[in-house]
Amino acid sequence: MIDPIAFLHLSPTTLADVLSRNQVMDCGIRPLWPGMARIAGPAYPVRCAPGDNLMLHAAIYRAPAGSVIVVQAGDLEYAVAGGNVCAVAQRRGIAGFVVDGLIRDVAEARANSFPVYARGVVPFPGGKEVAIPLNTPVVCGGVSVAPGDIVVADEEGIAVIPHAQAEAVLARALAKAEKDGAETLDAWESAHRARIEEILRRKGYVG
């Protein structure tokens, strides 16, 4: 069984090179401030109803330490979490939030260095009316996320590695990172130019 922390030293950029496009979230979900630390951990999926944040507030007491709580929020009008929720999640060992929606009190999360990736910030809180089963598959940033899938997020993007593919993806990504790290810029430029010129030749481009 792969320890999700093994992915912590791999950029989502490297992972994207060995994953399909439907395993990388869309660019609208971003770190909410510059310099946010990369996170990697098993997904604990949460779905919230429109205008409601009950299930994320419940999840912070149920998700195992080290988890990345991945939230399918129901709207882009209300916040699903604020400063205290982020602080409690951090204190309980949650690695971070990835939210297809909005949060509030971003300054508090930033001051505590608790990683939050979301679509933005709004001051209005959601309600607490709708109970939905926790730790079941969700869609976040256009990607299906199941419990235990590995989530890796940083300023480059957010990659989701299906749990069953984790070992194979890790091996491919480590090999890619090693190859890239050993290649000089001169070697890369030479190979890149040859490849581009060959593509242009096939396209009939002259110039």
Question: What is the meaning of each model-derived region?
Answer:
Residues 1-147, 161-207:
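Feature captures the catalytic cores and cofactor-binding loops of soluble hydro-lyases/lyases
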Residues 151:
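C-terminal binding/interaction regions
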Residues 154:
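Acidic/polar active-site rim loop that often engages polyanionic ligands
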